[in-house]
Amino acid sequence: MNLTRQERRRRERQAYKDSRKKDSDTYEMSIKLLQPWSTPIMKTELPPKILQTMTEISDQVIADKDAESWGKNLAGQINTELLIEHDILNQTGMMAFFLGAVRQFVITCKCQQMPFYSEAIQKEEWITQMLSMWIVSQYPNEYNPAHLHTQCQVSTVMYLKVPEMLPSRKKHRDKDDGSILFFGNASRDIDLSVPQLVCEPEVGDFYIFGAHQQHAVYPFRCAEGQKEIERRSISFNAIFQSKTDYDRGKKNEVPQAAVRPGESRPT
């Protein structure tokens, strides 16, 4: 069969397309990213009911002239840092919520730490206990220098109030002012990772991270004469242990002074 030049070229183009289509077949594959050498930062949002309750609790504590200042135990260059007693958390049901959140974080981290034992980790019972919880009522020009938390294993921060802030002076650094900064040291690969994470706070944001995770909080500025200038957050520290280890008598090496009698019951 004699083909015209035009028909021959058409068939050649079609054959080329068919070969490309065959080479570009897609496949469903199960993928796991294995990263046992770093502790994740878990970010979520407080349910509206939890956010409202914690805001009301913080309002009560700040209004209480006899509230205990917790600043002597903290790194922040911040004037108002107040302790929240565990009784009110138990009475409002907040304690159970936060211990459950810590438990989920621990399970997630343990599964990443030992990815080939994730099934056993998820079947394990994990005991969590809250140590101290405190309010950080931050105002313009106050800040938290780089630091970590000691005598605990897990730390958190939740944001209850975030004021309108003046924009950063430099457009190429527009996310610095008022942000929380997490530092990492697990990877030197600058092509596929970065050594720090800058997070702009929003009302309801809730972060859970390892207690030895270095972090800092940048100061911020507000417009002159602005009325609402408070950035309010709440943090707490916690410890955990597997029920298996607890039953074996392998208790955490945490000084007894870290948990005052009656502060929190393991759950």
Task: Give residue spans per PLM region.
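Catalytic core of non-heme Fe(II) oxygenases with the double-stranded beta-helix
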Residues: 129-208, 218, 229-230, 244-247
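Short, charged beta-turn/beta-strand-edge "cap" motif at the junction between a beta-strand
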Residues: 212-216
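C-terminal/domain-terminus segments
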Residues: 221-239
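Short regulatory "switch" loops immediately downstream of catalytic or recognition motifs
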Residues: 106-113, 160-168, 220-223
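Non-heme Fe(II)/2-oxoglutarate
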Residues: 20-123, 141-144
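Short Lys/Arg-rich cationic patches that frequently serve as NLS/NoLS or arginine-rich RNA/DNA-binding motifs
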Residues: 2-21, 261, 266
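Double-stranded beta-helix
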Residues: 233-267
